Amino acid sequence: LLYIFMHIIIYLHYKKQVMKNGRLVKETAALQQFLKIKRELHIRHTIPLIEFSGAASPMVLGFFCPVLVLPEGEYSEKELYFILKHELVHVKRGDVYWKLLFMTVNGVHWFNPLIWIMQKEAAMDMELSCDERVTQGAGLEMKKAYTETLLSTLHKGCGKSIVLSTG
């Protein structure tokens, strides 16, 4: 239970920092692209798009009121499209709820190394599944551009991740 409590406290503190120190993205092109992808994925609820200097990589935070967080920086139109679509696929699939479930199981069965492996594998599968959805029906050039975006994002931010976020 201490494990679960610790991660919830870390998550709440981080989300508070994002909401306090982040800034709402107001660039028209970025917001238009964001809304277009939301429509494409049939996501109806409001999701704030926030730029936060403390973010190591793009992520979704929140269970009931998700927030899409972008690290500060310049993104090309293609990079932004891929990043936003990847994160919104996480929202559409409810991956943050799965992560909460895995964290809870991990906290209860902390002594079982198979549970730790399962959590890590499940998180990796979630990411790969999102990657597959983003590139579904895309040509080789588009897949290459997406891969370059992933590598660029990885290169920019290799920080500590928050257990109760997607990214």
Q: What positions do the PLM features span?
A:
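Hydrophobic topogenic segments
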Residues: 1-167
